[in-house]
Amino acid sequence: MSRFKISLPALATRVAVLGFLTLMASVLGGCGAGQISQTATQEPAVNGNRVTLNNLALRDIRIQAAQTGDFLQSGRTVDLMLVAINNSPYVTDRLVSITSDIGTVALNGYTQLPTNGMLFIGTSEGQRIKPPPLQSNNIAKAIVTLAKPITNGLTYNFTFNFEKAGQANVAVPVSAGLAPRQT
């Protein structure tokens, strides 16, 4: 037998293995490449959710409650926290109501959103930085009377109804708030 007849099957095997490895490298490498990068956008480091409706932006939406047991029981009241921003330079808006499947939401205070202005709903516990001076008409309160038990780690559906912008639906998490560090 000539040496070409002996090494030809070995060469074909090597070429096939090398081709297979090259194909697998390109397939697996292509899984991470794409037109939309998963790390190209920055997300806010806040506890709450967010939603944008036309020129209105609702940010850091969360239920603020300290949970000591397995659930926050029905009948209890908890605070709904958020910041509403009106990005329109021409149109004022007003938060008419908030509804949820976990209970009734009572809005108290001035709920008008001025042009290019903000509306704070609730006051954050444990704020380390003093906020800029706010007028009393920039702060409202939303109190949720629970109709069913809720717990940390889950989100609950809320609908925000605005006079001009319409409705925005968002899943709102329960924020445990500031608690002493466990040791």
Swiss-Prot record:
Keywords from the UniProt entry: Cell membrane, Lipoprotein, Membrane, Palmitate, Signal
Keyword Transferase annotated: no
Principal subcellular localization: membrane
Record has Electron transport as a keyword: no
Membrane topology, as annotated: Lipid-anchor
Disulfide partners: none
Superkingdom, taxonomy of origin: Bacteria
Lipid group attachment sites (S-diacylglycerol cysteine): C31
Lipid tethering residues (N-palmitoyl cysteine): C31
Record InterPro entries: PCuAC_sf (IPR036182)
Subcellular location(s) of the protein: Cell membrane
This protein's GO CC annotations: plasma membrane
Signal peptide annotation: 1-30
PROSITE patterns, A to Z: PROKAR_LIPOPROTEIN (PS51257)
The protein's name: Putative lipoprotein LpqE
The species this protein was found in: Mycobacterium leprae (strain TN)
